[in-house]
UniProtKB/Swiss-Prot annotation:
Its biological purpose: Binds double-stranded RNA.
Lineage: Eukaryota, Viridiplantae, Streptophyta, Embryophyta, Tracheophyta
Residues of the signal peptide: none
DRBM domain mapped to chain residues: 1-70, 87-155
Keywords: Repeat, RNA-binding
Keyword presence, RNA-binding: yes
InterPro entries linked: AtDRB-like_DSRM_1, AtDRB-like_DSRM_2, dsRBD_dom
SMART domains with a match to the protein in the record: DSRM
Organism of provenance: Oryza sativa subsp. japonica (Rice)
Cystine pairs: none
Protein name, as recorded: Double-stranded RNA-binding protein 6
Length: 514
């Protein structure tokens, strides 16, 4: 409960959250805890030891809340809150409107190093310039300038109230009192300049006020080290006062401090650690940074380093000794490591042997080749072929007056073969006991060549009708026609079987009757 209230107060006051520290005592089976809380730079401890850490922290928070409640309203805390929220800029703008002066103008100057800049801002209000504390950024520098201007105007109000015997009214707003004091200040300046033109005008610049530092004791330590206050004493009662002569000498030579034989004069605290800040003996923001030593790694393919100077033999003085010889580094040998997935070595072209080629085509062909003419045969026995296609029979014709071709053969002559017997074969005659098939008689084939072939083929003599024998090779026929031809041959063999003489006479008589 108390921890939540203290945290809420810190958030409303724009402070950092309270930080708790714990002290543990006793054995492990029965520990004791004592807590302390840091609120806005102040330390509050619990009154005693507790069995749990939670109880100790709540007790420390309760002590902090009780101490803050007894103090009453804190003007320093209120000023800190206004400074964080930036209300002083609005207050200065309101005062400028009441006085009838232009709005305040801010001028910021940057100084310091590139990575650590320092901004200093000045604000001009009613012809008067106010300078604020330096800050790390421009926005905070403007807030500091507005706060310095407001504190300076409040000092002006107090000076005017002390000079005059008029009672100060607490009910009046502070902005109105500051505006009245600023108007009186400008009126007095005009009257003084009117009476004496050669008189010096009133000061137009108000630097930052020292009371602002006393009002915020923690702000001075925020920009410095947090360890330094722990080593320094809390009171200056043990420190030895310095004489004005020594202070003058120190001001003349700030970079050469004299060392005292007594170590306690340098460290006033008896039990303090010997802490001497280095920054006190050099100019701030203007000194050169110490050199940086970078340790370099030795490369892989480099010569071995030289031995240390202690390991070397004692050398003679430089005047008596010879100049050191020049040492050459050992040569570096790099062994190429081929990658794993490299292609195989490319083989060179194999030697070619010259070969002499004799052309055979130039020799004259001795044997004459007769032209092959495609012949189409129409078979009259349609029943035996049973729907099969008519075979195309290649016919070889020997020309009597053929001359040996020189380079190419004679063109092929298409020949159409017509069957002489166009009548279909009659059905077998049933005589006597059974059906006797007729013997298969192959008619002569008449070959007739077309007219174009007659004109083209001059060597052919005689009539255009040529008697040729159509021989069909079983390899040139398809399977279906081959089966049909085999069946016809089987029937022909059956027809040539020996029969009786009586049956033959009956067949002849029957044929004569028809």
């Amino acid at each position: 409960m108390y921890k939540n209230q203290l945290q809420e107060l810190a958030q409303r006051s724009c402070f950092n959250l309270p930080a708790y520290t714990c002290l543990r005592e006793g054995p492990d089976h029965a520990p004791r805890f004592k807590a302390a809380v840091n609120f806005n730079g102040e330390q509050f401890e619990s009154p005693g030891f507790f069995t749990t850490l939670r109880q100790a922290e709540h007790a420390a928070a309760e002590v902090a809340l009780a101490a803050l409640a007894r103090r009453g309203p804190s003007y320093s805390l209120a000023a800190r809150i206004l400074d964080e929220t930036g209300v002083y800029k609005n207050l200065l703008q309101e005062v400028a409107q009441r006085v009838g002066a232009p709005l305040p103008s801010y001028t910021t100057e940057r100084s310091g190093l590139g990575h650590l800049p320092v901004f200093t801002c000045t604000v001009e209000l009613a012809g008067i310039t106010f300078t604020g504390d330096p800050a790390k950024n421009k926005k905070q520098a403007e807030k500091n300038a507005a706060s310095a201007a407001w504190s300076s105007l409040r000092q002006l109000v107090r000076q005017e109230a002390s000079s005059s015997n008029e009672p100060e009214s607490n009910d009046e707003q502070e902005q109105i009192r500051i505006a009245r004091a600023l108007l009186n200040y400008r009126l007095k300046e005009k009257m003084a300049m009117a009476n004496n033109p050669h008189a010096s005008p009133f000061p137009k610049k108000f630097p930052m006020q020292p009371e602002r530092r006393t009002a915020f004791p923690q702000s001075s330590h925020s920009s410095y080290s947090k360890i330094l206050p722990l080593f320094r004493p809390k009171s200056n009662s043990r420190s030895r006062p310095e004489s004005p002569a020594a202070s003058d000498a120190a001001s003349q030579t700030p970079f050469r401090p004299t060392e005292s034989p007594n170590p306690r004069s340098r460290f006033p605290a008896a039990e303090a650690a010997p802490y001497v800040p280095v920054g006190h003996f050099r100019m701030p923001c203007h000194s050169m940074a110490p050199p940086v030593t970078v340790r370099t790694s030795i490369p892989v393919f480099s010569a071995p380093p030289l031995p240390p100077p202690g390991a070397r033999t004692q050398q003679l003085p430089p005047l008596m000794s010879h100049p050191p010889p020049i040492r050459m580094a050992s040569p570096v040998r790099i062994r190429p490591a081929p990658p794993l997935f490299t292609p195989s070595a490319v083989q060179g072209p194999k030697p070619m042997m010259p070969v002499q080629i004799k052309d055979v085509q130039h020799q004259q062909i001795k044997e004459t080749r007769s032209p092959v003419m495609p012949v189409q045969v129409k078979d009259a026995q349609n029943q035996l072929l049973k729907g099969s296609l008519s075979p195309v029979i290649p016919v070889q014709i020997k020309d009597v007056q053929s001359q040996p071709p020189k380079e190419a053969l004679s063109p092929a002559i298409p020949v159409q073969i017509k069957d002489v017997q166009l009548q279909p074969r009659n059905e077998p005659v049933s005589i006597g006991k059974g059906v006797v098939p007729l013997p298969a008689i192959r008619p002569p084939v008449k070959v007739e060549a077309p007219a174009e072939v007659k004109e083209a083929s001059q060597p052919v003599a005689g009539s255009s009708v040529v008697q040729c024998k159509a021989d069909t090779s079983p390899d040139s026929l398809p399977k279906t026609q081959l089966k049909t031809a085999n069946a016809d041959n089987a029937d022909a063999k059956d027809d040539h079987l020996p029969v009786d003489a009586e049956e033959v006479e009956d067949i002849i008589r029957h044929l004569e009757l028809k």
